[in-house]
Amino acid sequence: MRFDVLTLFPDMFPGYLSQSLLNKAIEQQLVEVAVHDIRRWAKDKHQSVDDRPFGGGPGMVIKVEPVVECIEDVVPLDARPATVALMTPQGRRLDQTIVEELAQ
């Protein structure tokens, strides 16, 4: 099973991946994990990946373009069929049942 993690904070993952139960699965070659920095797909010189919300309001949102381009580049890296899961506040809660469905 392969996981490609798309993130703005790739430096957060090596410690976790090398110390957890996931590390044992990686060492036993049951799982592969690749971490991808979404900023690599940003188009401007500052590698900006966030923007103000459409229609105004407080806070920032992640631009869709770098995320889509990253997905389009990462999915073909593995010949196996891919399931793409995008995490959003409005989505379904990722629970054990969903994880088991995705593992099939």
Describe each model-derived feature in a short phrase.
Residues M1-L77:
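N-terminal nucleotide/polyanion-binding subdomain common to many enzyme families
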Residues K63-Q104:
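S-adenosyl-L-methionine/SAH cofactor-binding core of RNA-modifying enzymes
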